[in-house]
Amino acid sequence: MAISLTGNWSICIAATFQLIFMLVIGLMILYGHLNMIYMMPIVNVSNNFISNLNDISSNLAGFKSVSDVNSKLLNIIDSHGQANKFESNYDGNICLEHVSFGYTESKMIIDDLSFKFEKGKKYAIVGSSGSGKSTILKLILGYYPAQKGNISVLDSKNVSMIHQESHIFDDTIRNNLNMELVQTDETLLKCLEFVDLPEFKLDQNIGEDGSNLSGGQVQRIGIARTIAHLKEVLLCDEITASLDAQTAIEIENRILDLKDETVLYVTHKYFDETLKKFDCILVFKQGRIVEQGSFEELMKNKGCFFSLKNKGCI
């Protein structure tokens, strides 16, 4: 409402100014102080001045609205930055203590969840759609603040994440992999081998929106980019969804072979070869962990994991 009123007042002031200006010009011509021939150029200058005045007032109103939005965004960013508890005596583990989160208070996506992800271990996170698998990764990364409970990590800057869909730029593969931190060509070539793209050249242009690549190749470039700048914790959210089974298994195996990194791997795919290599499989249902254990243990129990796997839901 304030912005609308500001715009209306500026229009009234501009119209009043132009009316007074025209009256003054008319009186000057009437009393012989101004030649009629100069009237049109003066009117044109007046119109341009009024137009610029209107633009300035409109921009001021726009700046006011942006300022309000910017203030709200900064508050949101500040709250997200304080979502997790960053501990100076961090021992490498990620601890979730009675964490609850929902986009609305009436429906919790994560419900009173407690778990400790131990440093260097590899965790598969499975479950049906909407069970909270991807949400828990976003909470750990600090995308959203937990409404209840604590999430203890060292710092979100020490967490890498690979999303289901990668975004790339109309540039060379080298620049797409390097981003803000430049790596050696040797390192970048190893990252391309990691995602089974050894034939790609670093100076090769990707094209606008990856037009020179297939969807699977775009995703693999995104994975290689994260591997090139790997942090202590690696979060993976359905990263092989667009890949064929053989390529997906190869990349999953290489991620599982990482020695020191803690890996949280959300997946819907059920490759026995890779699932057996995870230190622990967590089964999510309605925002809670309903089962956990090794592949062999969960298959032997014939519970929720067994059912999901046989139905092809993971």
Predicted features and spans:
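Catalytic Walker B motif of ABC-type/P-loop ATPase nucleotide-binding domains
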Residues: L234-E238
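Cytosolic ends of transmembrane helices, especially the final helix of ABC transmembrane type-1 domains
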Residues: I42-I76
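Helix-to-loop junction immediately C-terminal to a conserved catalytic motif
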Residues: L141
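A hydrophobic transmembrane-helix motif
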Residues: M1-S46
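The feature captures the beta-strand-to-loop junction immediately N-terminal to the Walker
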Residues: V126-S128
